[in-house]
Amino acid sequence: MCLGRCVPGAVRDLVARNPIITLTTDFGTNDHFIGTMKGVILSIEPDAQIIDICHSVQAFDVLDGALTISQAYSYFPTGTIHMVVVDPGVGTARRPLIVSSDRHHFVAPDNGVLSLIYQREQRLSARHVTGEHYFLQPVSNTFHARDIFSPVAAYLAKGVDPEKFGEAVTDFVRFSAPKPKAANENTLRGVVLKVDRFGNLITNITPQDAPMLFGENPGTFKIVVGQREIREIKEAYALGAPGEVFGIMGSMGYLEVAANRGSAAQLLGVGKGTDVNIVLGEAAAGQ
């Protein structure tokens, strides 16, 4: 990872010509928050294209926010500005950041919500935003998304150099997403990271963690979630019988436990944080 003056000026140039700002929050859509943020952005940069990635991140759940932005950001054009506000520490001493990679800018609180970006991007520059003249005044301690993050994103869209906002930092908050671990010689233990809108259980298990599940001849295995033992991997949701629970490789790159036209979470009575055990060989066949 490169920190400091390492991001080419081409990103700044493309932002100025074609400003796209994405929004990822846990604010929901029942209140005025999102509309107000868009109003602030457009008042500063009327040419901004504002794209909603997601406003249904689980409330206060920084890991869910990190997963959400990590799945979406790379599909946007070079120069896109991603505002990510999942901010249970709003109004405290936690820092507002601008993080720049070779292709994108991120505006977010320094609470780890960009942790998966830090893992994936090799060249990054992070800055603590201290230039209060870029803020909407007076700053509310309960709505930094309106008063700090939105105007900062808008000024970036206008082409203001990230260096103008504050000093470079290297001690930003980051965490590692939970990784599967060997429970014993025959069992790999993962966890449900999130439950999507359809009730699919998205685990933290990748094909690299469990190649035996996704090869042409997977051998004997079972996936244990709650009280249910699952012994099939399907290639598409519709290949399961209605209500059948099975494993599938999801578009996020993780093993999912899913049900055809049903909610695996409801059928199994489990949710985020539930253990997912993959048992192999004779240990799987013996029960």
Language model regions located:
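Short, charged beta-turn/beta-strand-edge "cap" motif at the junction between a beta-strand
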Residues: 252, 282-285
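Active-site histidine-anchored catalytic micro-motif
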Residues: 19, 44-50, 64-67, 75-79, ...
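Surface-exposed interaction regions enriched in Ser/Thr/Asp/Glu
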Residues: 274-281
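Structural motif
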Residues: 19-22, 48-51, 80-83, 96-98, ...
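Conserved active-site and cofactor/substrate-binding residues in soluble primary-metabolism enzymes
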Residues: 32, 36, 45, 60, ...
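Anionic-ligand-binding alpha/beta catalytic cores of soluble enzymes and soluble regulatory domains
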Residues: 136-214
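N-terminal glycine-/serine-/threonine-rich phosphate-binding loop
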Residues: 2, 6, 14-93
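A conserved acidic, glycine/proline-rich C-terminal tail/linker
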Residues: 204-269
